[in-house]
Amino acid sequence: DKAKRWLFNYPEESCVLLQRIADECAKFLVAQICAGAQIIQVFDSWAGELSPADFRTFALPYLSSIAEQVRDHLASMSIESPPMIVYAKGALGHSIHEIIKSGYNVIGLDHTIEPMVARAAVKKARDGKTKMSQVAGTKGSGHPIALQGNLDPAVLYAKPEVIQERVRRMFKTSTGGFGGQGALVCNLGHGITPG
């Protein structure tokens, strides 16, 4: 609540601070890549705590800035950018089209969005109905953006047969799953819950 109060009471100052944080995150990610990281992921685990308008004001521009700065800095050193993943927990339901345009190669899905909904949004972007970042994806790929995640981490506490069924369901079109369409990293929809 304190952070949101700050955002609402000091929006300009918040944006300045968020840009500084994005700048430092980008520098840190570039250092990781220069040290050998072959893929990077940017997490915004609190994105769903913001309304759609607030997400587009106080989160999305800075997620985009990180991706752009990382690529620009690497290009200035003649280093190819590795794949970049963005994970904005809870924001996909209202902002997936904007997240697709944010400059990342992979969109991390939480367990609250059906994979086929996300895949349809990626397909719409690929087909030119949505302006998409020129840096995302690779030439010649079936889909310019891959998807990752979606399995509810709490399922790991279930019996093995339940876990197996949930993983199978991730791939079935009839249950909203990926349906064998496009690039997918099978993964959890968030971190492993302690306990």
Task: Annotate each PLM feature.
Residues 1-195:
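Active-site loop segments of alpha/beta catalytic cores
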